[in-house]
Amino acid sequence: MSSQTKFKKDKEIIAEYEAQIKEIRTQLVEQFKCLEQQSESRLQLLQDLQEFFRRKAEIELEYSRSLEKLAERFSSKIRSSREHQFKKDQYLLSPVNCWYLVLHQTRRESRDHATLNDIFMNNVIVRLSQISEDVIRLFKKSKEIGLQMHEELLKVTNELYTVMKTYHMYHAESISAESKLKEAEKQEEKQFNKSGDLSMNLLRHEDRPQRRSSVKKIEKMKEKRQAKYSENKLKCTKARNDYLLNLAATNAAISKYYIHDVSDLIDCCDLGFHASLARTFRTYLSAEYNLETSRHEGLDVIENAVDNLDSRSDKHTVMDMCNQVFCPPLKFEFQPHMGDEVCQVSAQQPVQTELLMRYHQLQSRLATLKIENEEVRKTLDATMQTLQDMLTVEDFDVSDAFQHSRSTESVKSAASETYMSKINIAKRRANQQETEMFYFTKFKEYVNGSNLITKLQAKHDLLKQTLGEGERAECGTTRPPCLPPKPQKMRRPRPLSVYSHKLFNGSMEAFIKDSGQAIPLVVESCIRYINLYGLQQQGIFRVPGSQVEVNDIKNSFERGEDPLVDDQNERDINSVAGVLKLYFRGLENPLFPKERFQDLISTIKLENPAERVHQIQQILVTLPRVVIVVMRYLFAFLNHLSQYSDENMMDPYNLAICFGPTLMHIPDGQDPVSCQAHINEVIKTIIIHHEAIFPSPRELEGPVYEKCMAGGEEYCDSPHSEPGAIDEVDHDNGTEPHTSDEEVEQIEAIAKFDYMGRSPRELSFKKGASLLLYHRASEDWWEGRHNGVDGLIPHQYIVVQDMDDAFSDSLSQKADSEASSGPLLDDKASSKNDLQSPTEHISDYGFGGVMGRVRLRSDGAAIPRRRSGGDTHSPPRGLGPSIDTPPRAAACPSSPHKIPLTRGRIESPEKRRMATFGSAGSINYPDKKALSEGHSMRSTCGSTRHSSLGDHKSLEAEALAEDIEKTMSTALHELRELERQNTVKQAPDVVLDTLEPLKNPPGPVSSEPASPLHTIVIRDPDAAMRRSSSSSTEMMTTFKPALSARLAGAQLRPPPMRPVRPVVQHRSSSSSSSGVGSPAVTPTEKMFPNSSADKSGTM
């Protein structure tokens, strides 16, 4: 019964143990499930974050593009607007500046959001992807380690189970042995008790041995059981000890796993997860914070610009920007009628009483008006202050609308209901408009009153001065002298040329061969015109011109004329460009032959630009040389034009689109749509790499396109040559000495009066300013420099410093006298003059035309023609500047590239100044007496002021006098011949006619040389010119302005008109109004003047 109970207890213990082990196994499995679930939740989180940032990056990119489009929309809108021009001219108004900064901030935000998109896509999302990979990898590693730990833990529990069963078994055996031992002891005790009672009384003597053997058996059995018990007890003790030790170890292992190992296992799963995620989020925060910082920086710039909004500064900027519009005009001058010389208010006795009464009435009226106007001004100031208070109310703070709290909606609604409500807005607008209306009413009243006060005050002051009511201001300073009239510029038509081959719709090669023009006239002239006026024309060659004007220009070219040679005849740039395209489009044989079409198109397959350029060069080198010369000229021009693509919007590709169909015709059988893109690419390549494709001038002679062209038609005569001088052009390559650029001296002058220039070409200066003079642009103008700026300086507003006082005073008096009385000479002399500009025939009034006959060098410069076989002297100073250095006044402000250079030679302003200074003027002796006296004065002059101008200091006065005498004789003869032929009366000069007539007796006939071509007329034979007899490169001395003798002691009147800048005359090889004819010069001779002697001439 006891064993059965014991057996049940063993089963219960084992069942309880097994239940406990099963529970542990279940826990271990659930642990892995929990860790796996945690890992999956992290992966899902990371995946959601990646998707979120990917979508946010797309939104940021879309937002960036939207901002860029928004900014570009308005930027392109204002790029060609007036505000953009203001910005370029550094006249930026403060509101426009704020607008530009807002656009700039928009672009900045666009770039920042694009950067944010890049950070999200290439940084944050990549980091999250890496963290996801780390989570999966760490969970797998942790799971492997966890499984190993679970196996170890289960192994320990299995060992404990085994030891426990062993312990139970040995303990059961020990208990069994113990019970047997106790039973044996009881039998032994019972046996001893029986044997003790019977031994004395009952047992017989013969029964004692039998009882002794029974006792021995019991003792032996007891000993045996005792031994068995001891053995089982020892085994049970050992088993119990093992069981207890294993039990402690198992409990310790389970405790360690649950307390430490599970935590460490979770740490392994979390290894670096939070740190990596934190770095990722910090990257996101850094990007957002930097975006916010960038935004704040941009907003700070805008805020600074808003703080600098200044109406007064903008007002000054607008007035400075449009100074020609807002500057005060010239004062109205008294215009005497029919010789009336009284120019002041007369206060003689018949009108003195009336003037005095009028004076007192004005005085009373002015006092009343001033009081009334002062009250109006005070009211105006108060109204302005009220209006400013209304306009400067601080209603711009909307921070309440961005309060993120539960009461946000109530705050927003409260804000909207108070200030920005429709009722309040309407009320404030009504008050503002009412105040503005009152302000403008008072302003109008104030302006009208102040205008009236100004007019009455002027009358009052003049009457006060006339009536002698106050101290009369002493006239301590003189007024500026009258400036000369603007010389008239007259177009001289180009000589007609007749060719046997058509210019348009013909063969270009045949025309070039027939005409001798290396570049057809229409190509050269159109390109020159566009170079001067159209490089910045937006959409040139793409925007069509007027068809009527295109046809007109075309017809002129077909007649052999050049309609673009005269800059005064303004032509539409797009029409000129259309004529150029029309010429190439109408050629019988396209510029690129159809036979080479496939070869040129095949070059597009070459990806390497160098190989493509080389292949195109090999194809074009097979074309005729005349065609290559034209191609080289045209594509050099197109490349130059493309350099202004920022302004004209015509880059090489756009030009190729315009010129592709014109220059390359698609052969029959080819698909125009597919071929056109290839044609455009070929033309674009040639435009970009034209220097590498076409041969250089050394390899192929012919005209070369120059980026800097002169402003007029380039003929091969000197600026001072007369019509017909081209007949005597010497084509030999002589080496005559001529005035060099380095042999010219600069002249300093001091401003005698203030002068404000009316155009960019005229310099503005103050009285007493130091001026640097280059050369004489005309009778009345100098080319000079002031404050580092080159321009025109009026002669009568300055005092030349480095001249001899007596000579300059005498010469200036004569020049001033002639400038004032030139047109008022006797009618008989005037009737002999033509109705033409004084600048039309320079040689009519001086010997510059005769001495200006030149021989042309290969570089296009003018070399003075030798007058005698053995004369090697330099020409007199009357010789004009060479073709290389035309007058500076030729520059036209309509194009920044229209600079006065010929043949493309780019020189510094100093060299051009020094080159032109040597030709300060030409001398005109009206008769032989003046000639002889002038000759004697010039030959006896011993001044060495300009002794440093050259190294040729051994000239003999006799040889120079002989040269001058021959020149004077020729000039006088031609002058008389021209006067005999001219029969039309000269047009009167409106300005000079208003001056007082010259009181001296009429002198010889002479027109006023108001020309920038350096001609100075000397009518008085006593007024001679100084020159150095020791220099072969002497120049005209300059003049000091002096008042005419007839005006001595009299108060000078203000100038009747403001100074006018000289206009450069277009030089021409022939004159329609001249009596001296010359044969027509072909364009080839104009382009290559030394083609017969030197073939290296360039355009």
Curated annotation (Swiss-Prot):
Annotated site location: Arginine finger: 542
Native source organism of the sequence: Homo sapiens (Human)
Biased composition (Low complexity): 1026-1038, 1060-1074
Keyword entries, A-Z: Chromosomal rearrangement, Coiled coil, GTPase activation, Phosphoprotein, SH3 domain
Domain SH3: 744-803
Single GO molecular function: GTPase activator activity
Residues in coiled coil: 352-392, 952-987
Protein name according to UniProt: SLIT-ROBO Rho GTPase-activating protein 3
Domain notes for this protein: The F-BAR domain mediates oligomerization, binds membranes, and induces plasma membrane protrusions.
Tissue specificity field: Highly expressed in adult and fetal brain. Expressed at low levels in kidney. Isoform 3 is expressed in the kidney but is absent in the brain.
